[in-house]
Amino acid sequence: MANVVVIGAQWGDEGKGKITDLLSRSADVVVRYQGGVNAGHTIVVDGQVLKLHLIPSGILYPDTTCLIGSGTVVDPKVLLGELAMLASNDIDASGLKVASTAHVTLPYHRLLDQAMEQQRGNQRIGTTGRGIGPTYSDKAERSGLRMIDLLDEQLLRERLQGPIAAKNLQLQKLYGLEPLDAEEVIAEYADYGRRLSSHVVDCTRAIHDAARARKNILFEGAQGTLLDLDHGTYPYVTSSNPVAGGACIGAGVGPTLIDRVIGVAKAYTTRVGEGPFPTELEGSLSDHLCDRGGEYGTTTGRRRRCGWFDGVIGRYAVEVNGLDCLAITKLDVLDELDEIQVCVAYELDGQRVNHFPSSASEFARCQPVFETLPGWQTSTADCRSLDDLPEKAMSYLRFLADLMEVPIAIVSLGASRDQTIVVEDPIHGPKRALLSA
């Protein structure tokens, strides 16, 4: 048995969906432990493109149990839409389980999220506008609604009437928006409760039952380390904890249940939204990475900012998450470049620094210190083993492994499942007997 956490080692969008899908073949249970519909992952199976925001990637395997844990925030309308989409593609998701204690995103959360972001003006954060921050805010203020509350219409009415009245005051007085009709909202969410009732369970109990039965459990994070509320580039972060420790809180397990942690990182770096980005590129190189990598957000459709691989934030992600190994994705995007740069340190106010600064103003002043490596200028898309890779591509991977001080277990060379090199099974294989410098 092995219980594994998969996290993003950058600013999200690293390709965790594909890696989780790949690892789900060896998992009995897959748990999504934080985030909401602000995250998205794309899976390509036999040329079929599936885009999911809430449902774990493991749903494509009929023998894998998928759980949406307590640390997530659930938009029931989106969840029902994903279930319908899967059904239309002949994928059975009837076994999906949603934590009864997961908090619910409501219409006023979305409206407030969008209004607050607009009001920030030049200080905007880059929120997706899906209501995630306000949902987590209500959770922290102990005024939120949980999935279990949707199952009892009378309780739902009691729990919603006060908050709707209070949020309507905010919408009207602060933002000049029309108020919500309380009866319409209550009726809508009572209907969601009826339609989702068969999926709502005590997920923490289900996870511990699986652990006692010595099942393989895969914990799937959303977003990435640098978007973590406590450890990311605050305030340009999400409202939850994507780091490995967040799996324990969001799933309701102790750290001793986790056997290993896998970090997913692109062979370059991207970021959506606002905030400092030391290795960001502009012009034709940025356009090349964006076009070759299809760098447009699954959730928002926004173009992602692109830059060179940043080893400083990479090492920080290794430390914060206790990474055992890495999955490097989109190596093929670099195939046509004659030179590739990698950030190995920063220069801050004339001093070389090797660490990620906690101060946002300091991080904004950091200039990258690059090392330049030769490109391989040949396609890697059809490579299926390390021996198939060009030597310069292998040298690049070894350089990243040495820089990050952690071995590489998986190399992804395209969106499809088969465009993958598994150096060593990161679930069942020996720790650290993988690709390293």
Swiss-Prot record:
State the free-text cofactor note: Binds 1 Mg(2+) ion per subunit.
Reaction(s) catalysed by this chain, per the record, are: IMP + L-aspartate + GTP = N(6)-(1,2-dicarboxyethyl)-AMP + GDP + phosphate + 2 H(+)
Localization in the cell: Cytoplasm
Top enzyme class, one word, equals ligase
Q: Does the keyword Cytoplasm apply?
A: yes
* Organism for this UniProt entry: Synechococcus sp. (strain RCC307)
What name appears for this protein in its UniProt entry?
Adenylosuccinate synthetase
GO molecular function terms attached to this record: adenylosuccinate synthase activity; GTP binding; magnesium ion binding
Q: Which Pfam families match?
A: Adenylsucc_synt (PF00709)
Self-association and partners = Homodimer.
